[in-house]
Design a protein with these regions (language model features):
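Glycine-biased strand-turn-strand hairpin within the trypsin-fold
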Residues: 23-40, 44-99, 107-109, 120, ...
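C-terminal recognition in membrane/secretory proteostasis and scaffolding
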Residues: 2-5, 21-29, 36-40, 89-91, ...
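Active-site loop architecture of trypsin-fold serine endopeptidases
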Residues: 25-26, 31, 38, 60-62, ...
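Residue-level recognition of beta-strand microenvironments
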Residues: 52-55, 95, 102, 127-129, ...
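Short glycine/Trp-rich loop-beta-loop segment that forms part of the substrate-binding cleft
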Residues: 98, 120, 153-174, 254
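Cleft-lining beta-strand/loop regions that shape enzyme active-site pockets
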Residues: 148-154, 162-165, 207-210, 378
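Short, acidic, Ser/Thr-enriched surface-loop or helix-capping motifs
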Residues: 87, 93-94, 116, 121, ...
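Bacterial N-terminal signal peptides
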Residues: 7-17
Length: 463
């Protein structure tokens, strides 16, 4: 029992060092400091943390009705529908009623509601979705007041061991506060977004916490709680949050009226440094981002970056792997330049890279209709911007599938987001108009050549 009490007291002093912790990280100097409470912080923060409820119409699953031939033969239009509901959390980031949450909380929603800490509810519209970061921004409808917001902390200033509070709506029970510490920084192997650079915390995070706030001891937002590692479905002390510096970029795009996030584009393909590569380069440790190739007429090319260069730092921040570089590069504001340190031939060079967006030549996105296997797929031309978004080579031939509608013919035959269609029935597909035209033709068989994960696949489907 003594040990339990001691551990509890230890956590109290670690977690309640209040404002001074963010500044000098000192230990408590008196018993009075040990009796401090989180309540003042929570009272400031809670009004800006909201509950998010999303609803969408889905089809009841029946394996017999999955077969289009079965449906056509018996004259069945489709599977019966029902309303599916999900819940999560969000953070108010602008007094006008802008709320940041996770894309996976509101994905596919036909209706979104936001419940405030004072129990008032508002209909909300989705103003921006950024699947690459799993962040979305909502706007409260029919609201004419100023709402409480959270200030952003600089997540780069976080340290392992810093005290944090997680606030959200776990399991839909209502707003809940848990405490813990920053367990790790720059987690890059979580595998849930394009930008792998998460804050890890042992503050209890459960289903329903997604989109909620992770705050420091000054009540500032340091992250958006997004995922957990769990074998049971509940908290096991390993939670992940998107750093506030990434959240700030997405929120700023929404505040400026953008429908998509505009980010700097390097125009180079990077790869991780393996122990073998490190040994061949004479490195003590396998760290950095190795340049595999550089696209012509890109910011990387203009800066003088070359294949086989090893990026070791950006603006003074060390780079351990390509994920770290991607995160640090894209959280820079557009305009101006960024200084990159590279190793080339045993020497360190400093290169100045312009912070520009990828050129977005006419992507001409089309949602394919008709009775072909492509029905329900949205396809786009492969511009540099599309290639950057979907991790493709910009010089790849074909058109890429950017979305696959649930229950569509394209989904039923197994097409996936990111598939590149290069030929159909021996006709080369160079742009979306080519595929749109071919997909409207009648055919008994569809012979399709596509790229998936860098591998060419030839398939034949019935008409």
């Amino acid at each position: 029992m003594t040990l339990i009490r001691f551990v509890a007291a230890l956590f109290v002093f670690l977690l309640v060092a209040a404002p001074s912790l963010a500044q000098d990280r000192r230990v408590p100097s008196s018993a009075a400091e040990l009796r401090l409470s989180y309540a003042p912080i929570v009272q400031r923060v809670q009004p800006a943390v909201v509950n998010v409820y999303a609803a969408k119409v889905v089809q009841n699953h029946n394996p017999f009705l999955d077969d289009p031939l079965f449906r056509r033969f018996f004259g069945i239009p489709g599977q019966p529908e029902q309303m599916q509901r999900s819940l999560g959390s969000g953070v108010m980031v602008d007094p006008s009623g802008l709320v940041v949450t996770n894309v996976h909380v509101i994905e596919g929603a036909d209706q979104v509601k936001v419940s405030l800490s004072d129990k008032r509810e508002f209909e909300a519209e989705i103003v921006l979705k950024d699947p690459r970061s799993d962040l979305a921004v909502l706007r409260l409808k029919d609201s004419h007041e100023k709402f409480p917001t959270l200030d952003f902390a600089n997540s780069d200033e976080l340290m392992v061991g810093d005290v944090v509070l997680a606030i959200g709506n776990p399991f839909g029970v209502g707003q809940t506060v848990t405490h813990g510490i920053v367990s790790a920084l720059a987690r890059t192997q979580v595998g849930i977004t394009d930008y792998q650079f998460f804050i890890q915390t042992d503050a209890a995070i459960n289903p329903g916490n997604s989109g909620g706030a992770l705050v420091d001891m000054t009540g500032r937002l340091v992250g958006i709680n997004t995922a957990i590692f769990s074998r049971s479905g509940g908290s096991q002390g390993i939670g992940f949050a998107i750093p506030s510096n990434m959240v700030r970029v997405v929120a700023a795009s929404a505040k400026s009226g953008g429908k998509a996030v505009r980010r700097p584009w390097l125009g180079a393909h990077l790869q991780a440094v393996t122990p073998d590569i490190a040994d061949s380069l004479g490195l003590k440790t396998p760290s950095g981002a190795l340049v595999a190739s550089v696209l012509p007429d890109s910011p990387a090319a203009h800066a003088g970056l070359k294949a086989s260069d090893l990026i070791v730092a950006i603006d003074g921040q060390p780079i351990d792997d390509p994920n770290a570089f991607d995160y640090r590069f894209v959280t820079h504001p557009l305009g101006g330049t960024s200084e990159i340190d590279v190793l080339r031939g045993g020497k360190t060079l400093k290169l100045s890279v312009a912070l520009e967006t990828a050129p977005d030549t006419n992507r001409n996105e089309i949602k394919l209709e008709g009775r072909s296997p492509f029905q329900g797929a949205t396809v786009a031309n492969i511009s540099p911007a599309v290639a950057d978004e979907m991790h493709l080579d910009a010089d790849t031939d074909g058109v890429v599938m950017t979305e696959i509608a649930d229950g569509s013919a394209a989904a039923n035959v197994g097409f996936q987001k990111g598939d590149i269609i290069q030929a159909v029935n021996n006709k080369r597909i160079g742009k979306t108009g080519d595929l749109d035209k071919v997909s409207r033709e009648q055919a008994r068989l569809w012979r399709i050549t596509l790229l998936r994960g860098g591998q060419q696949i030839n398939v034949t489907l019935g008409g």
